[in-house]
């Protein structure tokens, strides 16, 4: 679970960098949406991983 949280954190960071520096309003709004979506997924997976709740492999 923590592996997925780290992956989504990296995706969130990358989409934030490209979205917040973009000049086009359309791509900036999409990247900002993706940034907050992946940030939310990161937080959920991080909490689930720390609590020990997850899929048993």
UniProtKB/Swiss-Prot annotation:
TM ranges: 1-21, 33-53
Family annotation (InterPro entries): DUF1328
Membrane topology: Multi-pass membrane protein
Keyword RNA-binding recorded: no
Compartments it resides in: Cell membrane
Keywords tagged on the record: Cell membrane, Membrane, Transmembrane, Transmembrane helix
Protein's UniProt name: UPF0391 membrane protein NE0130
């Amino acid at each position: 679970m923590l592996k997925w949280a780290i992956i989504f954190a990296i995706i969130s960071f990358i989409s934030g960098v490209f979205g917040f520096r973009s000049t086009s309003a359309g791509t900036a709004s999409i990247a900002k949406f993706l940034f907050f979506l992946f940030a939310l997924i990161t937080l959920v997976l991080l909490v689930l991983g720390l609590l020990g709740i997850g899929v048993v492999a």
